[in-house]
Every structure is written in structure tokens, then in C-alpha cells.
Regions:
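Bacterial N-terminal signal peptides that target proteins for export
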Residues: 1-12
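N-terminal secretory/targeting leader peptides
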Residues: 10-13, 26-115, 123-229
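Sec/Tat signal peptide C-region and signal peptidase I cleavage site
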Residues: 19-25
Length: 229
């Protein structure tokens, strides 16, 4: 049975995250890339609780954390196909699939979290939502995933010049690859799950992500410098 869900989570920061659903069943499978200790994990668990509460228990949601159902691009495609019913997704890697997502994924486009909320609750957010709908995904809310900054194992990054020569992991989107390359670095698209080992073995020198992601999966153990950018 189809159930409508009201907007229960709101906006996001530089790294846009959303909750989507394409489900028509009583038992839903939900995807989340993050592990325990990340705010998105708590949000997805709360999402499952609210769905059960608002539907009087007629719909249950099982959240699979840690990306166990696949990488973000794979999970996004599974939501489109109905194999996964819901998930929280960063808009950066969605840009190659839904071009309108790039409108709000440009690096450093938002001045603050409040600015981001105003944009995403306005015409720009509506345009992205409409494009997602055309792709077979129903966005039901935006929320703050934290601003993305650089971290590495070589030294502090205080200016773009400090990125020169560094191999930096980025999301799979030409916008972020181009950002690092423009600073003189080497933007390297890579799945989030591969970053820890790649930092450990020197495959990459650094990465860019939000502070909760840096902390929750222990990237601080292999990258001693986090520079707010």
C-alpha cells in the first residue's frame, strides 16, 4: 500500500544530503553509507522510527548502515529500480546522473548553513527535486551533512597553494575533481569505503569531507591534519 510521508528532515550544507523514497511496500529497505557515530546514521534510524509511528506500524523500515547494500551510485540506481526503498544520499555523486544536482553542488557556493537552507527551500531546491522526480526518485527532505573540508597526512592546508602536488580523494563528480586540479592537486574520485586504506597505503595524500565523516570512520588515524576550508 502506498503511504505518503511528510517532510520530516530539513536541508543540508555544502555537501547536500537528502532522504528519498520510491517504495510501495509495507516493509522497506533503506540505505546509508555511514556507520555508528555519524549524524546521518542517527537521522536514518529516527526516520525509520517516524515512518513506523506515522503509519501506525503499517510500514516498517530496516536501515542498512555502512554501505552494505552497495556504493552510493549503486544504491541510487537500486532506489530508481525499486530494489532499495529509501536512502540518504549526497548530491555530489548524483550530479553525473541528475545534472540539476550540480546547481547546488558547486564548491563553496553557500555562505552558511542558513544560506543553504534558504536556497534548498526555494526555487533552486524545487528544481533539483523536480529533476530527481523525473529520474524516478521522490525527495522528501534536505538536511545538513556538514561542510566539506580538506584533510591529509602531510601538513596543514592554509591556502589553495598548499594543495599543489597532492593526490586528493574526491567524490565521483567532475566539479570536485576540477576544484582540486585547479589548485594544482590531483583530484582522485574514489568510493568513501576505500579512503581509509588509501590514506594508510599512500594511494592518496588526503581527502575532502565533513568533520563527522572524518571522525566516525577513523580517518583521523591516518590523516593528522584537518583544515577547515
Amino acid at each position: 500500500m502506498n503511504k505518503s510521508i511528510t517532510k520530516i528532515l530539513s536541508s543540508t550544507a555544502v555537501a547536500l544530503t537528502l532522504i528519498t523514497t520510491a517504495a510501495s511496500a509495507d516493509s522497506w529497505r533503506a540505505w546509508n553509507i555511514h556507520t555508528d557515530g555519524h549524524p546521518n546514521t542517527a537521522a536514518m534510524d529516527r526516520f525509520a522510527e517516524l515512518v513506523a509511528e506515522k503509519t501506525g506500524g503499517e510500514v516498517s523500515v530496516e536501515v542498512f548502515h555502512g554501505g552494505v547494500l552497495g556504493s552510493q551510485p549503486d544504491a541510487f540506481e537500486q532506489v530508481q529500480l525499486g530494489a532499495i526503498d529509501a536512502g540518504n544520499f549526497n548530491l555530489g555523486p548524483i550530479g553525473p546522473i541528475v545534472k540539476e544536482a550540480n546547481l547546488v553542488s558547486l564548491p563553496f557556493i553557500f555562505r552558511s548553513v542558513d544560506h543553504m537552507f534558504r536556497v534548498m527551500d526555494g526555487p533552486a531546491g524545487d528544481k533539483v527535486s523536480g529533476a530527481m522526480g523525473d529520474a524516478g526518485i521522490l525527495p522528501i527532505g534536505w538536511f545538513d551533512a556538514g561542510a566539506r573540508s580538506f584533510y591529509n597526512n602531510a601538513g596543514p592546508i592554509n591556502s589553495p597553494a598548499d594543495v599543489e602536488g597532492m593526490k586528493i580523494r574526491v567524490m565521483n563528480n567532475d566539479l570536485f575533481t576540477g576544484m582540486v586540479n585547479a589548485m594544482g592537486g590531483n583530484g582522485t574520485p574514489m568510493a568513501f569505503s576505500e579512503v581509509y586504506s588509501s590514506l594508510s597505503t599512500g594511494v592518496v595524500d588526503g581527502a575532502e569531507n565533513n568533520l563527522p565523516s572524518f571522525q566516525s570512520v577513523g580517518h583521523f588515524e591516518v590523516a593528522g591534519y584537518y583544515s577547515f576550508s
